Curated annotation (Swiss-Prot):
The organism's taxonomic lineage, starting at the top: Viruses, Riboviria, Orthornavirae, Negarnaviricota, Polyploviricotina
Record-linked InterPro entries: Flu_proapoptotic_PB1-F2
Subcellular location per the Swiss-Prot or TrEMBL entry: Host mitochondrion inner membrane; Host nucleus; Host cytoplasm, Host cytosol
Known function: Plays an important role in promoting lung pathology in both primary viral infection and secondary bacterial infection. Promotes alteration of mitochondrial morphology, dissipation of mitochondrial membrane potential, and cell death. Alternatively, inhibits the production of interferon in the infected cell at the level of host mitochondrial antiviral signaling MAVS. Its level of expression differs greatly depending on which cell type is infected, in a manner that is independent of the levels of expression of other viral proteins. Monocytic cells are more affected than epithelial cells.
Family, as annotated: Belongs to the influenza viruses PB1-F2 family.
A GO biological process held by the record: symbiont-mediated suppression of host cytoplasmic pattern recognition receptor signaling pathway via inhibition of MAVS activity
Compositionally biased tracts (Polar residues): 14-28
Region entry Mitochondrial targeting sequence, spans: 65-87
Protein name, as recorded: Protein PB1-F2
Region of interest: Disordered: 1-30
Entry keyword set: Apoptosis, Host cytoplasm, Host membrane, Host mitochondrion, Host mitochondrion inner membrane, Host nucleus, Host-virus interaction, Inhibition of host innate immune response by virus, Inhibition of host MAVS by virus, Inhibition of host RLR pathway by virus, Membrane, Modulation of host cell apoptosis by virus, Viral immunoevasion
Remaining remarks: Is not encoded in all strains, and seems to be dispensable for replication.
Length: 90
């Protein structure tokens, strides 16, 4: 699973198409740019806090159509609290 954390979220979604750049080269084009950027921000924040890999459930993130920053923060906090509570009791 260590290698999976190094893979950017945009590559794991399969929502990548291409667009031609100014020089005619094909470049990746994100289908859901805002949600991808928000997820990247949350992923970096969670990594800084050294949250265990169990906290991040990729399928949940991928199932979100238009996540808002408030929702993502709330969701991450709930997951962190549940994990912390579990760690203290075990």
């Amino acid at each position: 699973m260590g290698q999976e954390q190094d893979i950017p979220w945009i590559l794991s979604t399969g929502h990548i198409s291409t667009q031609k750049g100014e020089n005619g080269q094909q470049t990746p084009k994100l289908e859901h740019h805002n949600s991808t950027r928000l997820m990247g921000h949350c992923q970096k924040t969670m990594n800084r806090v050294v949250m265990p890999k169990q906290i991040v459930y990729w399928k949940q993130w991928l199932s979100l159509r238009n996540p808002t920053l408030v929702f993502l923060k709330t969701h991450a906090l709930k997951r962190w609290r549940l994990f912390s509570k579990h760690e203290w009791t075990s």
